[in-house]
Amino acid sequence: MSIKEWFEDRRKITGLLKNSVERDSKDANETEKNKNLSIDYAKINRLWAQCDNCESLLYIRFLRENQSVCKECGYYLQMNSSDRIELPIDRDTWHPMDEDMYTLDVLQFHSENEPSHSDHLDSEDESYKDHISFYQIETGLTDAIQTGIGQLNGIPIALGVMDFKFMGGSMGSVVGEKITRLIERATAESLPVIMVCASGGARMQEGSFSLMQMAKIASALYIHQKDKKLLYISILTSPTTGGVTASFGMLGDIIIAEPKAYIAFAGKRVIEQTLGQKVIEDFQVTEHLFGHGLFDLIVSRNLLKGVLSELFRLYGLPRK
């Protein structure tokens, strides 16, 4: 090889290296750009929400001021438990109960079929504890319900609010225990109980421990309603299904439902497969069920506090 040929080879190699470095630099810039875009999308998600019905883009602050009702079509979006507590409770009167109660994985439940929520875990490596931890971080709650004592237009009440954003509002041992303790305290202090239901039913990861909560809560309510003659109002929101519908959801002295809520025990597909026949559309929606006598009232969110206050007045409950 001549000296001239050697220099030409060096120039070719240098050019290839330069192109490679430029490509790597460009790829790195694209990656950083995409990363920045994802951060911007995260910020957008905290500021805007999309209506599940009409797909309108809704500004979160205005949506909360409108009690999570779409201003375009009137559709009721899901509310978290903290926002729901603010609806009926007077300002600075809320005193939460059992905030530090959390679930123990007594069954050592492990599912390979559940989707993974953690970046560093594959679904087959993720346990029930991992799922609980994920939702605790996402919602800021220890489990799928908040309970406490507050005042509604000056009337002391015991209030429990389920949160569907925490594992679909499923009822496990902690949810059942918190509701039972709330009812027992209300019974001891002669307070009315209001339960806001939003749940997919019993929590499968806790097996019979979850199913046992249905009987435990019903037993506490029996003493509250039958023995002490105290008022219990159940408010059903979308969705209320499964073991919650089959227990305390339908045990209220007065049962209130939100408009167009999905309320059921089993889903439509399960019913059709069991009965071997088709069922009509929307047969598990509030308005259809109300027409068949399952509820006492259908109340919109903006009227709820006034309606509850009037019911308490008719019941003769004293202001504090």
Curated annotation (Swiss-Prot):
PROSITE patterns noted in UniProt: COA_CT_NTER
Reactions this protein catalyses: N(6)-carboxybiotinyl-L-lysyl-[protein] + acetyl-CoA = N(6)-biotinyl-L-lysyl-[protein] + malonyl-CoA
Residue span, CoA carboxyltransferase N-terminal domain: 47-320
Residues the entry annotates as binding Zn(2+): C51, C54, C70, C73
Compartments in which it is found: Plastid, Chloroplast stroma
Record key words, sorted: ATP-binding, Chloroplast, Fatty acid biosynthesis, Fatty acid metabolism, Lipid biosynthesis, Lipid metabolism, Metal-binding, Nucleotide-binding, Plastid, Transferase, Zinc, Zinc-finger
Cofactor field: Zn(2+)
Cofactor binding description: Binds 1 zinc ion per subunit.
ZnF C4-type span: 51-73
Enzyme class: transferase
A GO CC annotation given for this chain: acetyl-CoA carboxylase complex
GO molecular function: acetyl-CoA carboxylase activity; ATP binding; carboxyl- or carbamoyltransferase activity; zinc ion binding
Pathway in which the depicted protein is active: Lipid metabolism; malonyl-CoA biosynthesis; malonyl-CoA from acetyl-CoA: step 1/1
Principal location: plastid
UniProt GO BP: fatty acid biosynthetic process; malonyl-CoA biosynthetic process
Xref: InterPro entries: AcCoA_carboxyl_beta (IPR034733), Acetyl_CoA_COase_Trfase_b_su (IPR000438), ClpP/crotonase-like_dom_sf (IPR029045), COA_CT_N (IPR011762)
Purpose: Component of the acetyl coenzyme A carboxylase (ACC) complex. Biotin carboxylase (BC) catalyzes the carboxylation of biotin on its carrier protein (BCCP) and then the CO(2) group is transferred by the transcarboxylase to acetyl-CoA to form malonyl-CoA.
Family in the record: Belongs to the AccD/PCCB family.
The protein's name in its UniProt record: Acetyl-coenzyme A carboxylase carboxyl transferase subunit beta, chloroplastic
Taxonomic classification: Eukaryota, Viridiplantae, Streptophyta, Embryophyta, Tracheophyta
Gene: accD
